[in-house]
Amino acid sequence: MRTVVQQVREASVSIGGELHSSIGTGLLVLAGISRDDTADDLAWMSRKIPNLRIFEDEKGKMNRSLKDIGGALLVVSQFTLYADASRGNRPGFSESAPPELARVLFDRFVESIRHEAGCPVETGVFGADMQVSLVNDGPVTIILESPKKP
Protein backbone atom coordinates (compact mmCIF):
# COMPACT_ATOMS: atom_id res chain seq x y z
CA MET A 1 0.00 0.00 0.00
CA ARG A 2 1.25 3.45 -0.88
CA THR A 3 -0.04 6.77 0.46
CA VAL A 4 0.71 10.42 -0.02
CA VAL A 5 0.01 12.20 3.27
CA GLN A 6 -0.34 15.98 3.16
CA GLN A 7 -0.70 18.25 6.15
CA VAL A 8 -3.54 20.64 5.37
CA ARG A 9 -5.30 23.63 6.82
CA GLU A 10 -8.35 22.51 4.87
CA ALA A 11 -9.21 20.03 2.13
CA SER A 12 -12.31 19.00 0.23
CA VAL A 13 -13.63 16.67 -2.44
CA SER A 14 -16.20 17.76 -5.01
CA ILE A 15 -17.93 15.50 -7.51
CA GLY A 16 -19.76 16.94 -10.49
CA GLY A 17 -19.39 20.44 -9.09
CA GLU A 18 -21.03 19.49 -5.77
CA LEU A 19 -19.14 19.46 -2.48
CA HIS A 20 -18.97 15.86 -1.23
CA SER A 21 -16.75 16.10 1.86
CA SER A 22 -14.39 18.50 3.61
CA ILE A 23 -12.13 18.86 6.63
CA GLY A 24 -10.34 21.66 8.42
CA THR A 25 -6.89 21.18 9.93
CA GLY A 26 -5.60 17.66 9.49
CA LEU A 27 -4.30 15.27 6.87
CA LEU A 28 -5.29 14.60 3.29
CA VAL A 29 -4.42 10.98 2.49
CA LEU A 30 -4.23 9.81 -1.12
CA ALA A 31 -4.33 6.02 -0.88
CA GLY A 32 -3.14 3.56 -3.51
CA ILE A 33 -3.81 -0.16 -3.21
CA SER A 34 -1.45 -2.58 -4.97
CA ARG A 35 -2.39 -5.98 -6.34
CA ASP A 36 -0.29 -7.61 -3.58
CA ASP A 37 -1.73 -5.75 -0.58
CA THR A 38 -3.17 -7.67 2.35
CA ALA A 39 -4.91 -6.90 5.63
CA ASP A 40 -1.44 -6.50 7.18
CA ASP A 41 -0.65 -3.61 4.82
CA LEU A 42 -3.92 -1.87 5.67
CA ALA A 43 -3.35 -2.32 9.40
CA TRP A 44 0.22 -1.01 9.23
CA MET A 45 -0.85 2.11 7.32
CA SER A 46 -3.88 2.66 9.58
CA ARG A 47 -1.63 2.68 12.65
CA LYS A 48 1.14 4.74 11.06
CA ILE A 49 -0.76 7.73 9.66
CA PRO A 50 -2.62 8.99 12.78
CA ASN A 51 0.57 8.69 14.82
CA LEU A 52 2.98 10.43 12.43
CA ARG A 53 4.56 13.31 14.33
CA ILE A 54 4.53 15.86 11.53
CA PHE A 55 2.72 18.77 13.18
CA GLU A 56 4.80 21.43 14.89
CA ASP A 57 4.90 21.77 18.65
CA GLU A 58 5.26 25.07 20.54
CA LYS A 59 9.00 25.07 19.72
CA GLY A 60 8.43 24.69 15.98
CA LYS A 61 9.59 21.06 15.88
CA MET A 62 7.64 18.32 14.11
CA ASN A 63 6.63 16.57 17.29
CA ARG A 64 2.84 16.31 17.33
CA SER A 65 0.56 13.78 15.67
CA LEU A 66 -2.91 14.12 14.21
CA LYS A 67 -4.23 12.61 17.43
CA ASP A 68 -2.31 15.21 19.47
CA ILE A 69 -3.78 18.17 17.62
CA GLY A 70 -7.32 16.80 17.34
CA GLY A 71 -7.29 17.07 13.55
CA ALA A 72 -9.33 15.30 10.89
CA LEU A 73 -8.61 12.99 7.96
CA LEU A 74 -9.76 13.15 4.35
CA VAL A 75 -8.98 9.83 2.64
CA VAL A 76 -9.16 9.58 -1.15
CA SER A 77 -8.53 6.45 -3.23
CA GLN A 78 -5.96 7.01 -5.97
CA PHE A 79 -4.93 4.02 -8.09
CA THR A 80 -2.51 6.21 -10.08
CA LEU A 81 -0.04 6.06 -7.17
CA TYR A 82 1.05 2.73 -8.67
CA ALA A 83 1.64 4.15 -12.16
CA ASP A 84 4.68 2.85 -14.00
CA ALA A 85 6.02 5.25 -16.62
CA SER A 86 9.45 3.65 -16.95
CA ARG A 87 8.79 2.60 -20.56
CA GLY A 88 7.14 4.93 -23.01
CA ASN A 89 5.09 7.98 -22.14
CA ARG A 90 1.78 6.43 -21.19
CA PRO A 91 1.81 5.06 -17.65
CA GLY A 92 0.78 1.49 -16.99
CA PHE A 93 -1.14 0.44 -13.91
CA SER A 94 -0.44 -3.30 -13.68
CA GLU A 95 0.79 -2.93 -10.08
CA SER A 96 -2.52 -1.37 -8.98
CA ALA A 97 -5.11 -3.71 -7.52
CA PRO A 98 -8.03 -4.52 -9.85
CA PRO A 99 -10.99 -2.24 -9.09
CA GLU A 100 -13.11 -4.93 -7.37
CA LEU A 101 -10.32 -5.83 -4.94
CA ALA A 102 -9.17 -2.23 -4.51
CA ARG A 103 -12.69 -1.13 -3.50
CA VAL A 104 -12.93 -3.82 -0.81
CA LEU A 105 -9.45 -3.07 0.55
CA PHE A 106 -9.98 0.70 0.43
CA ASP A 107 -13.23 0.37 2.40
CA ARG A 108 -11.44 -1.81 4.97
CA PHE A 109 -8.62 0.74 5.19
CA VAL A 110 -11.09 3.56 5.88
CA GLU A 111 -12.79 1.45 8.56
CA SER A 112 -9.45 0.62 10.14
CA ILE A 113 -8.09 4.16 10.12
CA ARG A 114 -11.37 5.46 11.60
CA HIS A 115 -10.85 3.05 14.48
CA GLU A 116 -7.14 3.84 14.92
CA ALA A 117 -7.36 7.62 14.54
CA GLY A 118 -10.35 8.28 16.74
CA CYS A 119 -11.02 11.51 14.86
CA PRO A 120 -13.37 12.67 12.11
CA VAL A 121 -12.65 10.79 8.87
CA GLU A 122 -14.12 11.93 5.57
CA THR A 123 -13.66 10.22 2.20
CA GLY A 124 -13.99 10.67 -1.50
CA VAL A 125 -16.05 8.23 -3.59
CA PHE A 126 -14.18 5.19 -4.84
CA GLY A 127 -13.84 5.26 -8.63
CA ALA A 128 -15.49 8.66 -9.05
CA ASP A 129 -14.04 11.55 -11.04
CA MET A 130 -13.24 13.86 -8.13
CA GLN A 131 -11.88 17.34 -7.75
CA VAL A 132 -9.66 17.47 -4.67
CA SER A 133 -8.85 20.90 -3.24
CA LEU A 134 -6.44 21.59 -0.43
CA VAL A 135 -4.50 24.26 1.38
CA ASN A 136 -1.20 22.54 2.10
CA ASP A 137 0.30 23.56 5.44
CA GLY A 138 4.07 23.88 5.55
CA PRO A 139 4.07 22.37 2.98
CA VAL A 140 4.45 18.97 4.59
CA THR A 141 4.02 15.99 2.26
CA ILE A 142 5.09 12.48 3.25
CA ILE A 143 5.07 9.39 1.01
CA LEU A 144 4.51 6.14 2.89
CA GLU A 145 4.74 2.57 1.65
CA SER A 146 3.80 -0.46 3.69
CA PRO A 147 6.78 -2.74 4.39
CA LYS A 148 7.75 -5.15 1.63
CA LYS A 149 6.94 -8.78 2.14
CA PRO A 150 9.84 -11.27 2.18
UniProtKB/Swiss-Prot annotation:
Location of the protein in the cell: Cytoplasm
Signal peptide range: none
Name this polypeptide is given: D-aminoacyl-tRNA deacylase
Entry text on domains: A Gly-cisPro motif from one monomer fits into the active site of the other monomer to allow specific chiral rejection of L-amino acids.
CDD domains to which the protein is assigned, alphabetical: Dtyr_deacylase
Protein EC: 3.1.1.96
Organism placement in taxonomy: Bacteria, Pseudomonadati, Chlorobiota, Chlorobiia, Chlorobiales
Pfam families assigned to the protein according to its UniProt record, in alphabetical order: Tyr_Deacylase (PF02580)
Organism of this sequence: Chlorobaculum tepidum (strain ATCC 49652 / DSM 12025 / NBRC 103806 / TLS) (Chlorobium tepidum)
